[in-house]
Amino acid sequence: ILELLQQDRSEMELNMLQSSVQVALARLNSFISKAGAYNEIGELSLYPVVKKLTDEFEENVEDFCSKLQQVGELLFNSQNLVMGVTIEEGLYSKFAQEITPLLETLAEASANKSVQLQDYVLPVENQQEALMSSSQVQYVAKGANLYKLGYEMTGAYQVLDMLLRYEYFWVKIRVQGGAYGAMTRFNLDGDMMFVSYRDPNLAETIKVFDETADFLRGFEASDREMTKYIIGTMSGVDTPMTPRLLGNNAQRLYFRGVTYEERQKRRQQLLHTTVEDIRNLAPAIEACMEENNLCVFGNAGVIKANEGLFQKLTPVMD
C-alpha cells in the first residue's frame, strides 16, 4: 500500500510541474461550480492528504485501511449501478452473458446493505488564489459560470474560442506579452474560463482578459473571414473518435443529461454564427470577468509582487 501511495505522490508532483495549466484550471473551476469543486477534491486538494499518508504511514496505516474498506463497500455494489459498453451489436449478447457473474457478485456483496445517493455540501464562492511554486512562468486563469449569471451557452461560444485563441489572445498575450499561448474553456455546465500558459506576466494578462468584452464589442469580420472561423471550429468539433472515445463521450453526455436535440441546436448555432452573434457575447463575458474568480499558478516572487490581487497565497509542494 505504501508503495502505491508513494507512486501516487510522485505522479501528483510530476503533474504539478508538467501540467500546471490544468492544476490552475481545476482550482479555478472549484470556485465556479459544484461539479468543479467535486472534481478538484481529487486534484491539488488531495496532495496534502497523500503527502501526510506517505510521511506518517506507520502511524496511520490501520485507520487508513479501515477507511479503504468502507469506501470499497460503497463502491463495489449493484445499487445505483449504471454500466456503459461500446461494442459491435452482434457481440452484445455474449458480453451480457460474460458480465452476469460480476453483476451477481456485486449484488451479493451489497445484499441487505442500503447505499444512499450522496448530495455533498461543497462550498462554491468567488475566490482569488495564487498557487506559489518555483516555476519561472505563470499560468493565469479567470472565469465564471454563465448560467448562474443568467446567460445561455450557445454554439457561438465555440466560434469565440477559435477567435480568441488565434486572434485576440494570440496578439495580446503571445505576441505582445511573450507567453507561450492562451486559450478558453467552455463546457456544457456553463463554466467559462480563460487561461494563459508559460506566461512571463500576471497583472498584464488579467487586464487582457478583462478587456475581452471591449474587443468583442468592436469586432469586425467579412463573410469570408467568418466562414474561415466556423470551418476552423468545425474541424475540432467533428474530429473522428475511436470506439473508446465514443463510449466515454456517450456516458459523459448521459450523466449530464444532454440530449441529441440540444447538441444539434448548438451545432446549428455554431454553423450560422454571425459577426453580430459574436458582438452579443460581450455582456456575458464582461459579467464573467467582473465575478473576479481568479487562480494563478506561478513563481512565488512574481506572485508576492502582485499579492494585492489575491485573497489567498498557497505554496504548492511546500
Please provide the spans of the model-predicted regions.
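C-terminal structural cap/anchor segments
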Residues: 187-252
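A structural supersecondary motif
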Residues: 143-145, 161-200
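Generic hydrophobic alpha-helical scaffold/packing signal
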Residues: 161, 170, 174, 206, ...
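A generic structural motif
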Residues: 87-91, 148, 196-202
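Short acidic (Asp/Glu) and glycine-rich catalytic loops that position anionic groups and cofactors
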Residues: 43-49, 76-80, 134-141, 150-153, ...
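Extended hydrophobic-aromatic, low-complexity segments
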Residues: 94-95, 151-153, 170-172, 181-184, ...
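Active/ligand-binding-proximal structured segments within catalytic/core domains
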Residues: 1, 152-163
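C-terminal regions of mature proteins
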Residues: 2-122, 128-132, 146, 230, ...
